[in-house]
A protein has these predicted regions:
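Conserved N-terminal beta1-alpha1 strand-loop-helix module at the mouth
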Residues: 1-90, 94-98, 105-108
């Protein structure tokens, strides 16, 4: 039996002054997904990418955008990231007051 796996390089390691280069490297390297780490400087001690950047990514690539939210109150960001073009949204259950509600929100977005 063979296992299928998806390579999802994180854009977090990119040079933020040249994100287009990082998107091109992912495309040229054959990665089907791009992992987007979202940090709010509250749930984790770093501040990274928001919905406008994901919207920009979506306009530049058709790769699967895997958005990983490391944020307080993730329910507030589901719709903005979905509208920006995220293909998958994940969150930390310990940051959520209503885990099942957020899952339903993601599914409906």
């Amino acid at each position: 039996m063979t296992s299928e796996f998806k390579l999802s390089p994180s854009i977090l390691s990119a040079d933020f002054s040249n994100l287009q280069l990082a998107l091109d490297q992912c495309a040229n390297g054959g990665a089907p997904w791009i992992h987007v780490d979202v940090m709010d400087n509250q749930f984790v001690p770093n501040l990274t990418i928001g919905p406008p950047v994901v919207k920009s990514f979506r306009s530049k690539t058709q790769k699967f955008l895997d958005v990983h939210m490391m944020v307080i109150d993730p329910e507030k960001l589901v719709e903005p990231f979905a509208k920006a073009g995220a293909d998958m949204i994940t969150f930390h259950i310990e940051a959520a007051a209503d885990t099942l509600g957020i899952i339903d929100l993601i599914r409906s977005s």
